[in-house]
Amino acid sequence: MSSAVRIVEKQLDEILAIARNPAQIRNAGTLAHVDHGKTTTTDSLLMGAGLLSPKVAGKALAMDYVPIEQLRQMTVKAANISLYFEYGGKPYLINFVDTPGHVDFTGHVTRSLRVMDGGLVVVDAVEGVMTQTETVVRQALEEYVRPVLFINKIDRLIKELRLSPQEIQQRILSIVKDFNALIDMFAPPEFKDKWKIDPGKGQMAMGSALHKWGITIPMAQKAGIKFSNIVDAYEKGYVDKLAEEFPLYKTLLTMIIEHVPPPNVAQKYRIPRLWRGDLNSEVGKALLEADPNGPTVIAVSKVNKDPHAGLIATGRVFSGTIREGDEIYIIGRKMKKKVLQTYIYMGPTRIIVPYMPAGNIVALMGVDEARAGDTLVTPSLADIPPFERMRYISEPVVTVAIEPKNPAELARLVEALKDLVIEDPTLDLKIDQETGQILLSGVGTLHLEIATWLLKERTKVEFSVSPPLIRFRETVRERSQVWEGKSPNKHNRLYFYVEPLDETTVELIATREITEEQDPRERAKILREKAGWDTDEARGVWAIDDRYFNVIVDKTTGIQYLREIRDYIIQGFRWAMEAGPLAQEPIRGVKVVLVDAVVHEDPAHRGPAQIMPATKNAIFAAFLSARPTILEPLVRLDIKVAPDYIGAVTSVINKHRGKILDMTQQEYMAFLRAELPVLESFTISDELRAAAAGKIFWSMQFSRWAPYPESMLADFVKQLRKKKGLKEEIPKPTDFVEAF
């Protein structure tokens, strides 16, 4: 039995006693740019809880429990742990999540934030606030998660940069200023001032996770410690004394207890943001108070496959108490399930607990159909609204084809891939039913590399992986004429036009301000007031494609039997959006409008096999007559480089169809922000490193979709079609419908 399991079992009674008192619970996690030291920091917290030997803390990467994480020294999944800590004579339960820092794994961060009330943001003292720091802080603030700051790797300022005590102080103040600028930019208005970091109040710690020490300004003032003393500790070789006097775990856990709100406080402002139900109802009040005696409501943040126990759903109990044997209802999936076991997590280890009350993070066995983002409730609450859906900031834009060496193992491979997509919804799986071709899409090449490694580990199946391909989108640039779609039996006729969907509406869909599930009157009001839609169109929204950001609108009046075929038209619309007519890439940002219809009176002549193709073909014809184009994904680069190399770095970016968006200079460093196509990004890392003789930091993340250059568009579409085995010639509207 591992020491972690022994200690948790020893503390289990205390943990369960605290778990019923929300004031003594904190839900927090690490957030950071890649390689800024999150997991090493978490190791120090484990050491403080007695779960890791002091000799290996800082080296063990205990929360990196997937073997490839330890191999790559990088977190690729979010790991949970429950820590017992005494502070001010009281015991506390700190539910802690270690999240990935690499941009390819922001989906794991998104899911983790749902269960957190506070984020310990780790920043490298040399690199400072980087792109991914900005991304995770923005994500946290959108979920109303309060950030606190740990400036790590102070040892680098002393040993590598050889800064004086005064320069170290200036560097720290500069990072705090940059960090507060993010809070000013992204925090909810009511928290912009309250959540800014004030080092004098102990909301910022500095130290070295590697050397296991950390200190806040109030601690330093109380102990009479100055920056010169810290420099001396490194220069004269008594860093161990720093770690003895100011152990990092104690400093960080104290900062979390003092500045991360307990669940009964945090839920008062988080629930109105996360849940659209009636706050004055019994369940609404229980959610606001994190009431352990209220009805059970759980938000699922992740689902993992266990080879023995099946799918394990992890989430936060926002209200009530969940017990082994309880029946729960999965909203949206319309099914009841029985909880077979309840656990808390200790890295990779699950510890069985008899129950878990509101305010805590819990893992459940027996709810195999639950998915990340789902809401689980007491069956009597089946009709309440679910929690808001999670918003992922990166889209799967890189694709590989996977083929088993032995065709007989295809089914096994597909099953394992389906499990991977359940665990990580930012992966996208497409299987061609005719050819059996498997296409797996991810946020980036590393995302797919990790996914295929996991696939190999789990299945032991030999398979080949193609070089990465980029996913594109299709869209239109103007309104089309009206086109008629006839059903195959010629008994039904549907009339559509398409036009670009305005950016405001796309953003309303992306931020979940408008959804398919919400009250149509409420949705129509938002579309009128925020996006300028006319009343008839706003009321006529039939369906919202929130994956690719398209809508279908009914502008007809008095059409007989239209209600009976409405669902088939919506299915035809979704079918069309999955793969457009230009190059079978998904359609994005299009409004499809139904203006007229002739529907056969006999149900036998107006089934899905008649209505769906009529819908799809008419939409494709309209699409091709509305100046269609291809959208390509762009990445944003944030670069820090010595000023001498600005010219060389700019040349590399320009060579790859990139554009410099912004450039500033401070002291010995220049800061560049650029954008370039994902298609051009595969070799840029080596080229940037060579151009700047290695003296460069940079990070990349998904930026936006942009039209492919017009001058190269026709040839590019032909290339895409050829790669997919389609006729090179771009189709015409009359290839889908008769001239009308």
From Swiss-Prot:
Domain of life: Archaea
Pfam families named among the record's database cross-references: EFG_C, EFG_III, EFG_IV, GTP_EFTU, GTP_EFTU_D2
One Gene Ontology CC term in the entry: ribonucleoprotein complex
UniProt entry tagged with the keyword RNA-binding: no
Family (UniProt): Belongs to the TRAFAC class translation factor GTPase superfamily. Classic translation factor GTPase family. EF-G/EF-2 subfamily.
HAMAP family: EF_G_EF_2_A
Stored PANTHER family: ELONGATION FACTOR-LIKE GTPASE 1, TRANSLATION ELONGATION FACTOR-RELATED
Protein name: Elongation factor 2
Gene name, Swiss-Prot/TrEMBL: fusA
